[in-house]
A protein has these predicted regions:
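Short Asp/Glu-rich motifs
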Residues: 44, 139, 166, 237-238, ...
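Gly/Ser-rich helix-loop-strand patches that form or flank binding pockets
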Residues: 18, 27, 113-162, 244-287
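A short acidic, glycine-rich active-site loop
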Residues: 54-68
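Structural beta-alpha unit
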Residues: 78-126, 222-253, 257-266, 273, ...
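Small/aliphatic-rich secondary-structure junction motif
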Residues: 1-56, 149-152, 159, 163-232
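Short secondary-structure boundary/capping elements
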Residues: 13, 108-111, 138, 178-181, ...
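Ordered, amphipathic secondary-structure segments that act as subunit-interaction surfaces
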Residues: 69-81
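Short low-complexity, flexible loop/linker segments enriched in glycine and/or proline
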Residues: 48-50, 170-171, 241-244, 269-270
Length: 287
């Protein structure tokens, strides 16, 4: 977790996104890179005077918002006491291993989510806010683009900034490829955690290893992990994961995203959808 990408848009959870990234950077000596995520402009310019003026006004508004995003990012990093690195500066391998947390702002990046999906492939993880339905919430498209297009994990910041991260880790295990990838990406956190719990829920499993098997596998990596398999009841697997996370004192949840199809979860609900709607702790996700 030596490099973190923070796409910055103006939403209510932005302070939590910054705080989450800083907590990870302090834990691993990471470089945090911020970019302004702007909507893609239309691929054509209207030829009439009114349409052309509207397009120009929208472009100017987007540029002003990007400048505001950069100022907020820099202010948050400075307030956290992180030193600044200039964009384009190379990381020396020998120095990077022992470097402390630091940040840089990357100006003038292309607009649109397509850029984010591609650029995020260069980073250990991308930190985004938990999406919501309110106008001031982070956009679902930002989360999904980074999740599906980057090939890297997503660290989901809760609406309220966390006080700590990575001391008590809960793995929401369902036997799937997606969760196996999330666990693999989370190994830096798991190796440093004080407590790890592998949790499975009856009714939330797909064919695959059990929670007990995962705990044994982690032991071979030098990680002590407890395991628990909860029986089916009136609560859904998503509710069981979050309820147990709260009782465990979890400050980081590990979860594979969309083991069931995204469309199915949109219609019928599912663990990923429940966590996206209700998680109050940081969540590391992979697809």
């Amino acid at each position: 977790m030596k490099t973190l990408l923070v796409p910055v848009t103006l939403h209510d959870a932005l302070p939590s996104v910054f705080a989450t990234a800083v907590l990870v950077a302090r834990r691993f000596g990471s470089l945090i890179e911020g970019v302004a995520l702007r909507p893609a402009l239309a691929e054509y310019v209207p030829v009439d005077m009114v349409g052309g003026m509207t397009w120009l006004r929208d472009e100017e508004a987007d540029q002003a918002e990007a400048q505001d995003a950069g100022q907020r990012f820099v202010a948050a990093m400075e307030a956290a006491g992180l030193p600044r690195r200039e964009p384009g500066a190379s990381c020396a391998p020998d120095a990077a291993a022992n470097a402390g947390p630091r940040y840089r702002w990357q100006p003038d990046v292309p607009p649109g989510d397509a850029f984010l999906g591609q650029y995020a492939r260069l980073f250990s993880a991308t930190v985004v806010g938990r999406p919501g339905a309110d106008d001031g919430s982070p956009r679902m498209t930002t989360f999904e683009t980074a999740l599906f297009e980057s090939g890297r994990p997503i660290l989901l910041a809760p609406p309220v900034a966390p006080a700590c991260l990575g001391e008590a880790v809960l793995i929401a295990w369902n036997g799937s490829t997606e969760t196996a990838r999330a666990v693999a990406f989370a190994m830096p956190f798991l190796r440093r955690a004080r407590r790890v719990l592998v949790l499975s829920a009856e009714g939330g499993m797909v064919p695959g290893p059990r929670a007990e098997d995962v705990a044994r596998s982690l032991a071979c990596e030098g990680i002590e992990a407890a395991h628990k398999a909860l029986p089916a009841g009136r609560r859904t697997p998503g509710e069981l994961y979050l309820d147990t996370a709260e009782s465990f004192g979890c400050d980081l949840l590990i979860k594979g995203a969309y083991t069931q199809s995204r469309l199915r979860q949109m219609i019928f609900g599912g663990p990923t959808s429940h966590i996206l709607s209700h998680a109050t702790v940081p969540v590391l996700m992979a697809h």
